[in-house]
């Protein structure tokens, strides 16, 4: 998976993207050389390739699924921080997966000293992310996950003048020059 670029000739093993995280979680292979952390959750090349081939929701599902099966609260916190960073940058990452390294570094740099897996991931972003995007932040410069901002609803070309939450709290409908329905449950 080295030197992955966004060309139409790129081909991805979609079965591997779906099955590997699922199977590693089910057999409890979180740590070690062949584990979930090193090969999937905190692996820049894996995340970038999966984001290039699959929708963001598929990537987030891997994080949510692993959190459900984890007992270690420190590992759960690290996985949640990365997932929330991806969620916060979702509007950009859905269209431009090349922004993965800047998004992760800009949001998680302040967390790297206390979280070894995040530190490893950001090191990979710093070294390998330059292949996709030369604009890598050197300082923490974006909203940190875990704060009051949970979602960023970006998609309107003009100012939003109204929005409503559905009674079941699952969707937000926003109005500008067009209506957009946002699924906030996922």
Regions found by a protein language model. Name each.
Residues 1-148:
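Hydrophobic repeat-domain scaffold segments
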Residues 113, 159, 180-181:
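Eukaryotic short linear interaction motifs
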Residues 153-160:
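WD40/WD-repeat beta-propeller blade N-cap
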Residues 163, 179-185:
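WD40-repeat beta-propellers
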Residues 167-168:
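Residue-level detector of Asp-centered blade-edge/turn motifs that repeat once per structural unit
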Residues 175-177:
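Conserved strand-to-loop turn within each blade of WD40 beta-propeller repeats
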């Amino acid at each position: 998976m080295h030197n992955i670029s966004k060309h139409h000739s790129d081909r991805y093993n979609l079965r591997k993207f779906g099955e590997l995280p699922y199977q590693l979680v089910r057999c409890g292979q979180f740590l070690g050389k062949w584990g979930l952390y090193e090969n999937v959750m905190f692996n820049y090349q894996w995340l970038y390739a999966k984001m290039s081939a699959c929708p963001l929701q598929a990537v987030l599902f891997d994080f949510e699924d692993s959190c459900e099966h984890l007992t270690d609260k420190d590992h759960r916190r690290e996985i949640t921080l990365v997932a929330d960073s991806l969620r916060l940058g979702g509007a950009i990452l859905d269209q431009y997966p090349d922004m993965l390294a800047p998004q992760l570094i800009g949001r998680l740099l302040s967390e790297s000293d206390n979280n070894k897996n995040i530190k490893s991931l950001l090191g990979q972003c710093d070294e390998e992310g330059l292949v996709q995007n030369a604009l890598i932040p050197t300082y923490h410069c974006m909203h940190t996950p875990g704060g009051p901002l949970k979602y960023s609803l970006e998609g309107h070309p003009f100012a939003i003048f109204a929005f409503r939450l559905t009674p079941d709290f699952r969707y937000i409908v926003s109005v500008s020059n067009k209506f957009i329905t946002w699924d906030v449950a996922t």
